[in-house]
A protein has these predicted regions:
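Outer membrane beta-barrel
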Residues: 33-54, 58-176, 211-217, 299
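Repeated loop/turn-to-beta-strand initiation elements of outer-membrane beta-barrel proteins
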Residues: 42, 79-84, 112-115, 160-164, ...
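Membrane-embedded beta-strand positions of outer-membrane beta-barrel proteins
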Residues: 46-48, 82-84, 117, 154, ...
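Transmembrane beta-strands of outer-membrane beta-barrel pores
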Residues: 50-56, 68-70, 77-81, 86-92, ...
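Residues that define the transmembrane beta-barrel architecture of outer-membrane proteins
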Residues: 60-69, 97-101, 146-150, 202-206, ...
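Solvent-exposed loop segments that connect transmembrane elements
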Residues: 175-197, 237-239, 269-293, 360-376
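Detector for outer-membrane/organellar transmembrane beta-barrel domains
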Residues: 203, 211-214, 218-327, 335, ...
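Outer-membrane beta-barrel "beta-signal"
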Residues: 208-210, 376-390
């Protein structure tokens, strides 16, 4: 059964100074050391989050409760660097779902080139996130956005305006504390309890991305465009091996404090399934559901930052719209729209999001929403988040 969605542990950690590194305490981070030295600098940051939700498609608790927490470690030195991120979420009890999101180390080949090894986000799309919202676009649930896998990534800066990534990922990021193989952070292929259902494992993922800053002389407008491609093997338990071929093009237009981001792409997965050739089982955040194997997708996002909106308060309104248009005749298109705003003051943030979904697995839908669709029509969610950043 599809379980309710957890908006993306926090355990309190005591860090002692190591090898006489000096400590610098800032308003939002803790850091030790100097990144310009061989020993390097360690930075600790994160947040703790509570939420309140109101849904028109189910009985809401209408209670403010702990939702999630994040702990991040960042290491930077003259030659080496690294990153670790750990999160915990509450479904029924504190941290009943927790996961390692990133854990990697890197080496700086030169000022313009570096290589990263370990669990990390894949260089697919304009960045890790394609929208400004906390809830995320439905491409997150489809397994195309905010994907974290185990592999190696080479990044090269070509001149002042061009960035290139070439990466290889041997397997998915796996699950940790939670409901078995449905407990990864990123959406990946999983197996249903039905023994007759194909078991799909994605391996040997090759990903490439190029991003180009377009120089616009004497203009306050900044334009970045690019594209990415993803090819992988899909090993089926029936002994056959299929492939995924996915791509997208993207662009970001910036004018002063305003940003417009557009993404358009295509996902083609041939799982070699003898029972369900048109969709596969995906799992994340302790939920299992179906995703169409072949679809086009579109994500649009706009945000505007207003500094000192009121005294020391900063305000960022934003909006996003996602379309997952499946190829299979009779499969209904999935959409998600989000209108939101975030208010920040010092280390505290308040975010409010009004979300409308149709054929949306986590907004009033069911396990088949991202495949054939559902009969729920438009469903709505009000999501309020209270965040303490450190």
């Amino acid at each position: 059964m599809l379980q309710r969605f957890l908006v993306k542990p926090f355990s309190f950690c005591t860090l002692s100074s190591v090898m006489a590194m000096s400590a610098a305490v800032q308003a939002d981070t803790l850091s030790w050391g100097d990144a310009e030295t061989d020993l390097g600098k360690l930075t600790v940051s994160g947040w703790v989050r509570a939420n309140y939700q109101d849904k028109d498609y189910s009985d809401s608790d209408h209670k403010l409760k702990f939702n999630a927490a994040k702990l991040s470690l960042k290491y930077d030195a003259k030659t080496f660097f690294g990153n670790a991120e750990y999160r915990c979420y509450q479904n029924d009890t504190l941290c009943d779902f927790s996961t390692l999101v990133n854990a990697n180390l890197g080496y700086k080949l030169s000022d313009d080139s570096r290589i990263t090894v370990g669990l990390q986000d894949m260089p697919f799309g304009i960045g890790r996130f394609w929208s400004s919202s906390w809830y995320g676009s439905s491409m997150d649930n489809a397994g195309l956005e905010d994907v974290h896998n185990l592999g190696i990534n080479w990044q090269q800066q070509l001149g002042d305006n061009t960035s290139l990534n070439l990466a290889y990922f041997v397997r998915d990021g796996g699950g940790f504390v939670g409901d078995g193989d449905a407990a990864p952070y990123a959406a990946n292929y999983v197996k249903l309890e039905d023994a007759t259902t194909d078991d799909i494992e994605e391996k040997n993922m090759w990903v490439a991305r190029i991003s180009q800053q377009i120089p616009l002389q004497d203009s306050p407008v900044k334009l970045n465009v690019g594209g990415s491609y993803w090819h992988s093997d899909l090993e089926n338990s029936n002994g056959q091996t299929g492939h995924r071929n996915a791509w997208n093009i993207f662009g970001r237009l910036n004018y002063q404090k305003a940003n417009l981001t557009l993404t358009a792409g295509q996902n083609r997965a041939d799982t070699k399934s003898l029972s369900n050739a048109d969709y596969a089982t995906v799992g994340s955040f302790e939920s299992k559901y179906f995703v169409a194997n072949k679809a086009n997708y579109y994500v649009a996002n706009v945000d505007y930052q207003i500094n000192d909106f009121y005294k020391n308060y900063d305000l960022t309104p934003y909006a996003s719209y996602t379309v997952f248009d499946k190829d299979k005749s009779g499969f209904a298109t999935s959409t998600r729209s989000i209108l939101g705003a975030q208010l920040d003051v010092q280390q505290f943030s308040l975010a409010a999001e009004y979300i409308t979904g149709k054929n949306d697995v986590f907004i009033g839908g069911d396990a088949g929403s991202l495949a054939g669709g559902d009969t729920s029509g438009h469903s709505r969610l009000l999501n309020l988040l209270f965040i303490y950043n450190f």
